[in-house]
UniProtKB/Swiss-Prot annotation:
Chief location: membrane
Protein location: Cell membrane
Segments for region (Disordered): 384-455
Region forming the signal peptide: none
Source organism per UniProt: Mycobacterium bovis (strain ATCC BAA-935 / AF2122/97)
Coiled coil regions, renumbered to chain: none
InterPro entries in the record: DUF6350
Bilayer-spanning residue ranges: 26-46, 53-73, 77-97, 111-131, 146-166, 191-211, 232-252, 256-276, 278-298, 323-343, 357-377
Protein name, per record: Uncharacterized protein Mb0980
Length: 455
C-alpha cells in the first residue's frame, strides 16, 4: 500500500512541471486567441455578415497582436495598437515567473524559456497556414511575410520571458557572474524612469483630451450608431499607448508625426489625421506656450531615475556608471516602444516618432537631471580619509631601559636571594668541602636533633 501511494505521489510530482510548461507555452496565446475569436464573431453577427473568411480574420488579428502588419486589398495596416502587445508581454512574464522559483536550476530555467518561445512560434505557424488557406476564398486578404511574423512573435515573447525569469533569478545570476552588484539597481532605475515618463505623459494626454473635448465630439459624430461609437471607443483605448508614447517623445524634445502632420514642443505642422477620437489630444496650430512646459515631464522622469540610483550610495565612478546604464536602458526601451507603435497607415503615410531624437532626449534628461538628483540625494559615498601614522617617540638615554636578553629565559627567571640562601646544601656539596650547618650555628636546627627547650 505504501509503495502504491509513493509511486502515485511521484507521478503527481512529475506531472506538475509538465503542466506548468504547457501553461507557459500556450496559456497567453490561447487566451488571446479566445478573446480575438469572440470579438470577431460578435462583430460579424452584429454586421449581419456571413462567416466566410472568419478564421482568416481571427488568425490575422492574432498575428496583429504581435505587431505583424495586416494587408487587406493592397493596403497595409502597419500601425498596430500597443495595448494588446503590452498585455501579451505581461501575460508571458507572469506565466514564466510563476513557473520559476528563485532556487530553480539552470536546466529548469532553460525549459521554461524554451516553452515560452516554442508554443507561440507553433501557433504563429498555424496562423500563417490558416491565413494562406483563407486568402484563396477572400482574395483581399494577403498572407504576411513569414520571416516578419516569426520574428515579431519571437521578440514579443522573448521580452516577456526574459522579464519573468529575471524577476525570479536575476539577483542570483548576477551574483554568479563578474558583473557589478549595482546592475540590478540600474534596471530598476530605468524602469522607474520609463514608467514616470509614460505615466506623466498619460496625464498630459488626458488633460489635452479635456481641452479639445469639442474636437473629440466631432470625431465621434462620423457615425450615428451606438455600435459604431462603441467600436471607436474600443479602438481609442487600444491605441492610447501609441498616443502616450508620442506624447513622451514630445516631452523629451523629440517629435511625433502622422503622415505630413508633425507635432513637437516647439512647432506644429498641420495635415490630415485619421478620425480616431484619441487623436483629438494632438496639439493644433498655433502652438501655445503651455506645450513648451511639457519638457517638465522629461525633467521629472530624470528625477525619478536619480532617486532610484541614489538609494545605495556608491563611489563616484560606480555611481556614474550605474546612472549611465540606467539611462541607456531607459532610452532603448523608449526606442523599442516608439518603433513598435509606428508603421504604415494606408493613405496617411508613416506614423510614429523621431526615434533618434527620442533616444537622445531620454539620454539627456535621464543623465543630466538624474546626475544632479544623485548628487543632491547623497548617492555618492566619500572615501574615508587615510590616517597618517603617528611619529615614533624618542626616549632619552636616562629613560632607556637596560637591554634584556630575549633568548636567555633563565636570566629573567632567577629565584630571589632569600630563597637561594634558605636552600640547604646537598650531599655532593658537602663532599666537595662545603660546610654543613651545625647545631651551634645560628641557623635552623637539623632535622634529626630536637629543638632546644626554653629554660
Amino acid at each position: 500500500m505504501n509503495r502504491v501511494s509513493a509511486s502515485a505521489d511521484d507521478r503527481a510530482a512529475g506531472a506538475r512541471p509538465a503542466r506548468d510548461l504547457v501553461r507557459v507555452a500556450f496559456g497567453p496565446g490561447v487566451v488571446a486567441l479566445g478573446i480575438i475569436a469572440a470579438v470577431t464573431l460578435l462583430q460579424l453577427l452584429i454586421a449581419n455578415s456571413d462567416m466566410t473568411g472568419a478564421w482568416g480574420a481571427i488568425a490575422s488579428m492574432w498575428l496583429g497582436v504581435h505587431l505583424v502588419p495586416i494587408s487587406i486589398g493592397g493596403r497595409a495596416l502597419g500601425v498596430m495598437p500597443l495595448l494588446p502587445v503590452l498585455l501579451m508581454v505581461w501575460a508571458t512574464a507572469r506565466s514564466t515567473a510563476r513557473a520559476t522559483s528563485p532556487q530553480s536550476s539552470g536546466l529548469v530555467v532553460r525549459w521554461v524559456v524554451a516553452s515560452a518561445l516554442g508554443g507561440p512560434l507553433l501557433m504563429a505557424a498555424i496562423a500563417l497556414a490558416v491565413i494562406h488557406d483563407a486568402s484563396s476564398v477572400v482574395t483581399e486578404l494577403q498572407t504576411p511575410s513569414a520571416l516578419r511574423a516569426f520574428t515579431s512573435v519571437l521578440v514579443v515573447h522573448s521580452v516577456g520571458a526574459a522579464t519573468g525569469v529575471w524577476s525570479r533569478v536575476g539577483r542570483r545570476a548576477l551574483a554568479a557572474t563578474a558583473l557589478p552588484d549595482w546592475l540590478h539597481d540600474s534596471m530598476r532605475a530605468a524602469a522607474a524612469g520609463v514608467l514616470a515618463l509614460l505615466g506623466l505623459s498619460g496625464v498630459v494626454t488626458a488633460g489635452s483630451l479635456v481641452v479639445h473635448w469639442a474636437t473629440m465630439q466631432e470625431l465621434y459624430g462620423i457615425t450615428d450608431s451606438i455600435f459604431g461609437q462603441f467600436s471607436l471607443t474600443v479602438l481609442s483605448v487600444l491605441y492610447a499607448p501609441n498616443v502616450i508614447v508620442g506624447t513622451s517623445a514630445i516631452a523629451v524634445g523629440s517629435s511625433a508625426h502622422i503622415g505630413f502632420a508633425t507635432f513637437s514642443s516647439f512647432a506644429v505642422l498641420g495635415g490630415d489625421i485619421p478620425a480616431l477620437p484619441i487623436l483629438a489630444a494632438a496639439p493644433t496650430p498655433p502652438l501655445g506656450p503651455a506645450w513648451v512646459a511639457l519638457l517638465i515631464v522629461g525633467a521629472s522622469s530624470g528625477v525619478a531615475v536619480g532617486q532610484q540610483c541614489a538609494r545605495r550610495a556608491l563611489p563616484f565612478v560606480a555611481a556614474m556608471a550605474k546612472l549611465l546604464v540606467a539611462a541607456v536602458a531607459g532610452a532603448l526601451v523608449m526606442a523599442v516602444l516608439g518603433y513598435g507603435g509606428g508603421g504604415r497607415l494606408g493613405n496617411f503615410g508613416d506614423v510614429g516618432v523621431d526615434e533618434g531624437a527620442l533616444v537622445l532626449g531620454v539620454l539627456f534628461w535621464f543623465t543630466f537631471v538624474g546626475w544632479v538628483t544623485v548628487v543632491i540625494a547623497g548617492g555618492i559615498s566619500r572615501r574615508p580619509k587615510r590616517l597618517r601614522p603617528a611619529p615614533p617617540v624618542e626616549l632619552d638615554a636616562d629613560e632607556s631601559s637596560p637591554p634584556v636578553d630575549m633568548f636567555d629565559g633563565a636570566a629573567s627567571e632567577q629565584p630571589p636571594a632569600s630563597v637561594a640562601e634558605d636552600v640547604p646544601p646537598s650531599h655532593d656539596d658537602i663532599a666537595n668541602g662545603l660546610k654543613a650547618p651545625t647545631a651551634d650555628d645560628e641557623a635552623l636546627p637539623l632535622s634529626d636533633e630536637p629543638p632546644p627547650r626554653a629554660d
